[in-house]
Amino acid sequence: MTGVAVPHRAELARQLIDARNRTLRLVDFDDAELRRQYDPLMSPLVWDLAHIGQQEELWLLRGGDPRRPGLLEPAVEQLYDAFVHPRASRVHLPLLSPAQARRFCATVRSAVLDALDRLPEDADTFAFGMVVSHEHQHDETMLQALNLRSGEPLLGSGTALPPGRPGVAGTSVLVPGGPFVLGVDLADEPYALDNERPAHVVDVPAFRIGRVPVTNAEWRAFIDDGGYRQRRWWSDAGWAYRCEAGLTAPQFWNPDGTRTRFGHVEDIPPDEPVQHVTYFEAEAYAAWAGARLPTEIEWEKACAWDPATGRRRRYPWGDAAPTAALANLGGDALRPAPVGAYPAGASACGAEQMLGDVWEWTSSPLRPWPGFTPMIYQRYSQPFFEGAGSGDYRVLRGGSWAVAADILRPSFRNWDHPIRRQIFAGVRLAWDVDRQTARPGPVGGC
């Protein structure tokens, strides 16, 4: 992978504006709607809106120093500290009104664009890229919240997607063994977040990985075969949670064979990647299928490494920026594309749809790469590393249909609790090259 130039100020301005336009579309509802909490897992949309502005002001106008005075009074600003106020509590806080939040965000953005325009050409612009990423990540969070909303739909059914391709579901590709470069440096990706860095060489034995993510039809076969009722496919923690939560199918699947998506009740497309499954469900499905979940290191090698050239690709298909012909990104579709829809987006090993569509659970806990150095926002990764005391997390890779193309790359690492399923997460299987069958455990019931 060759180094990537730091974006020019005009390109940064474009990214900031695109992110804000997307945010404003997601909050283009009346005040009562923006103040609602659709689920205790999520914030009211008006909290996300003001938090986006608060973080932008903190990092781009105040140098990341909360002691420097800002536009908000300290007592108001602390309402938007995600570490102080858990999501379930935010609906009860004396938040800015929707009109106040919009004005605050607009005032901050105007000052930020002025500051960007005055920056010297050789200035460090990492904080600007970090803020773009932060806003887009909250946009995806707001889409999760809107998907949990009950009542008449607020959003349409999404833009059209290319058709899938028969014969790819359930197939796998070989990833040769050997060393590869895991992670990136800032010279490779100027806005790579701290947990993606530094680049370093690791050796990975040969393995096979699913050509495409697991589909709804494949998941239906798991259900019909009693996969949710058979203890043998589940880990101890997974079975305990499956019984506690009464899991019988992916979230938003209805007993009549339909699903509910952003308030729309519709047939479940058999060739779409399954989404809204927990890590525990993904793990159980993999065991039932005679497979396993990939490690995140395996996933990144399958996505980015080109053994023919002995170097990383910037994207699975090469170094060219994502387009609508290569991946389903940006959120407009409001759903994953059918498997096989993007053959031109395949990685060097032949894996398809590795960026976009659904986040993919891996078996890996979140750990720092050797030589990890925290970025200016030191609380982004460190509190969530394994052993840091904030809970159990598993890494997800690849982004989803809701992720913006400006911020996604093969090295991007997401993470969540293994019980979360409101996220747009699915499954891609992996196999050791010398093992293709499951090893059933004990049978049991709840």
From Swiss-Prot:
Detail which positions bind gamma-L-glutamyl-L-cysteine.
Answer: 87-90, 416, 420
Give its E.C. classification number.
1.14.99.50
Q: Which Pfam families match?
A: DinB_2 (PF12867), FGE-sulfatase (PF03781)
- Binding-site residues, Fe cation: 51, 134, 138
Cofactor or coenzyme needed = Fe(2+)
Q: Please verify whether the record's keywords include Glycoprotein.
A: no
Keyword Oxidoreductase listed? The answer is yes
Task: Return one GO MF term.
Answer: iron ion binding
Superkingdom of the source species: Bacteria
State the reactions this protein catalyses: gamma-L-glutamyl-L-cysteine + hercynine + O2 = gamma-L-glutamyl-hercynylcysteine S-oxide + H2O
Query: What UniProt keywords are attached to this protein's entry?
Result: Iron, Metal-binding, Monooxygenase, Oxidoreductase
Q: Which InterPro entries match?
A: CTDL_fold, DinB-like, DinB/YfiT-like, EgtB, EgtB_Actinobacteria, Sulfatase_Mod_Factor_Kinase, SUMF_dom, SUMF_sf
The cross-references to Gene3D superfamilies, in alphabetical order and at most eight, read:
paralog of FGE (formylglycine-generating enzyme)
Explain what the record says happens when changing residue 416 to N: 200-fold reduction in affinity for gamma-glutamylcysteine, but no significant change in that for hercynine and in the reaction rate
Its pathway is:
Amino-acid biosynthesis; ergothioneine biosynthesis
Q: Which family does it belong to?
A: Belongs to the EgtB family.
Q: Please describe what this protein does.
A: Catalyzes the oxidative sulfurization of hercynine (N-alpha,N-alpha,N-alpha-trimethyl-L-histidine) into hercynyl-gamma-L-glutamyl-L-cysteine sulfoxide, a step in the biosynthesis pathway of ergothioneine.
The record's note on quaternary structure and interaction partners says:
Monomer.
Question: PANTHER family from the entry?
Answer: HERCYNINE OXYGENASE, SULFATASE MODIFYING FACTOR 1, 2
HAMAP family per the record?
EgtB (MF_02035)
Q: What is this protein called?
A: Hercynine oxygenase
Please tell me the species this chain comes from. Answer: Mycolicibacterium thermoresistibile (strain ATCC 19527 / DSM 44167 / CIP 105390 / JCM 6362 / NCTC 10409 / 316) (Mycobacterium thermoresistibile)
